[in-house]
């Protein structure tokens, strides 16, 4: 496993007949070497491992989206049958819950009703809660999304939903990285061999580098490094799911927005009699987990379902993550500047800086801001705006705040946002 083009940058795995998995463990390999040669020294371990790596073939990890390893075998999504484990399949992890073809919803806990309460009776959100479980248990396939459970209330159920997922998949199969940790040198290695990553209590701190997180979402390779070891490449399609009261902003705005799946958790159970059995008992109950796994495995969908609430949450996030867009929607359009045929770019620059100051933001306008602003304004209003050089008359300046008169030279051509 690792870089499929280089043994030097790949890890050495061995097949465990008891679990049906290929395992990567320096300690276990050393124990196997000692069983053959009890006099082996520390230096011997490394030499033997290097010899084995040289001799054994380099094989790709199982990447068939239709084969999902569960506790008691490999579930085939096409045939809906459970197949036995085999050393022919290069599998490094499996779901901790067994597949039960006769699984039924337990009479003592209505999972569907609970999901509905989490979603505030929004059927579209309920569907997405099930689809995210399907995505989380299949590390051989990615729908190229990063999940975010967001809710301002501290008692909205998102933590309990995550607990259900962790119990379903198994703690040892879940890494717990937060978004910012994917850019830290030695942290990303934690995702090796994991089925899913679930990070909770994330903050709204700015994410300067999201390249690793984006690569995992799309199934591309990332370079990882463990302390004292050489860097190597891995390919993982582990679903990354995060939760928090707010969302982090990111540099790569367009690509980042395209990958985000924001699920609003707007329920508030603070004023109700909380059923403590849900968190303490039901989400770890064997029958509940087998029913949830059965339902999730039998879902069929290519892309995540559409949801009005999700689209609205994404639109709101996009506005707050993109301060230029926020200025257009919160200040420029409400002041009806978009209705004017000509708006001096120097005015927009000054006005947007004022807006940033009022919002407590420290932002610098990028090179090429004028063209970018015209494009954003066109998309938002559905009209056409261009950045052009031309003159603006004194009487046209009366439509702007008084301070603008001293800033704009009406005698020479200047840059304008022109409505066509």
Where are these regions (language model features)?
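Feature primarily recognizes SF3-like P-loop helicase cores of small DNA viruses
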Residues: 1-10, 35-420
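Short, small/acidic-rich helices and loops at N termini and domain boundaries
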Residues: 11-40
